[in-house]
Amino acid sequence: MNTLRFPAGLYGVTPEWDDTSRLLAAVRDAAAGGMRALQLRRKHLSREQRLLQARALAPLCRELGVTFIVNDDWRTALEAGADGAHIGRDDATLAEVRAAAPGLLLGVSCYADLNRARELLAQGADYIAFGAVFPSPTKPQAAHAPLALLGEAAAQVRACGEPRPAVVAIGGITPANAGLVAAAGADSIAVITGLFEAPDIRAAAQACAAPFPLTD
């Protein structure tokens, strides 16, 4: 048995698009190609603008059966009716968010730090994210997380019992290298440019999702 707290496979992350209609259409295409989770990541929007996009995306994701996560802003996740929130190093602690919003799925950034992952797993993280596994156009200065790290992280989450937390990889992932990441031990891949800037979003989603068995 290998059940997960977070969907395996393709985890789309939104580009910096202000055109919500364009974004909704792209999410439909990605879901048709096999995307199973979506993160709203809008670093440069005001909280009010982010909430507007989140409220547009949440019902669409429910319709499509896509798990919906909001980056960096658990309050917006709650207000919009999202499934969860992603917490970075500079955000509130996982324990603080868990206490305030016990119903949310909570994912955390671990960068290339297995000790951080171990601590956050002990606090109940639903997924641990590592990256950048490849050079990233979104974060060109991001520290490198070697693929071998994913296998070590996979060993950590297996000790957590069932359903277990997921290991997510991010950074420079494309249809061409998704298989390498899956083989290294990732349960899920977070993809921005390689998905939403592709000429055919549905085909890119299919190619990114193909290496991942639907085991959760």
Curated annotation (Swiss-Prot):
Condenses 4-methyl-5-(beta-hydroxyethyl)thiazole monophosphate (THZ-P) and 2-methyl-4-amino-5-hydroxymethyl pyrimidine pyrophosphate (HMP-PP) to form thiamine monophosphate (TMP). Pathway: Cofactor biosynthesis; thiamine diphosphate biosynthesis; thiamine phosphate from 4-amino-2-methyl-5-diphosphomethylpyrimidine and 4-methyl-5-(2-phosphoethyl)-thiazole: step 1/1. It holds the Pfam family TMP-TENI. One of its GO terms (molecular function) is magnesium ion binding. The keyword Magnesium applies. Gene3D superfamilies: Aldolase class I (3.20.20.70). It catalyses: 2-[(2R,5Z)-2-carboxy-4-methylthiazol-5(2H)-ylidene]ethyl phosphate + 4-amino-2-methyl-5-(diphosphooxymethyl)pyrimidine + 2 H(+) = thiamine phosphate + CO2 + diphosphate; 2-(2-carboxy-4-methylthiazol-5-yl)ethyl phosphate + 4-amino-2-methyl-5-(diphosphooxymethyl)pyrimidine + 2 H(+) = thiamine phosphate + CO2 + diphosphate; 4-methyl-5-(2-phosphooxyethyl)-thiazole + 4-amino-2-methyl-5-(diphosphooxymethyl)pyrimidine + H(+) = thiamine phosphate + diphosphate. Binds 1 Mg(2+) ion per subunit. GO terms for biological process: thiamine biosynthetic process; thiamine diphosphate biosynthetic process. Its EC number is 2.5.1.3. This is Thiamine-phosphate synthase. The keyword Metal-binding applies. Its cofactor is Mg(2+). GO terms for cellular component: cytoplasm. The gene is thiE. 2-[(2R,5Z)-2-carboxy-4-methylthiazol-5(2H)-ylidene]ethyl phosphate binds at residues 136-138, 172, 192-193. Signal peptide: none annotated. Belongs to the thiamine-phosphate synthase family. Mg(2+) binds at residues 72, 91. NCBIfam families: thiE (TIGR00693). InterPro entries: Aldolase_TIM, ThiamineP_synth_sf, ThiamineP_synth_TenI, TMP_synthase. Keywords: Magnesium, Metal-binding, Thiamine biosynthesis, Transferase. It is an enzyme of class 2 (transferase). 4-amino-2-methyl-5-(diphosphooxymethyl)pyrimidine binds at residues 39-43, 71, 109, 139. Transmembrane segments: none annotated.
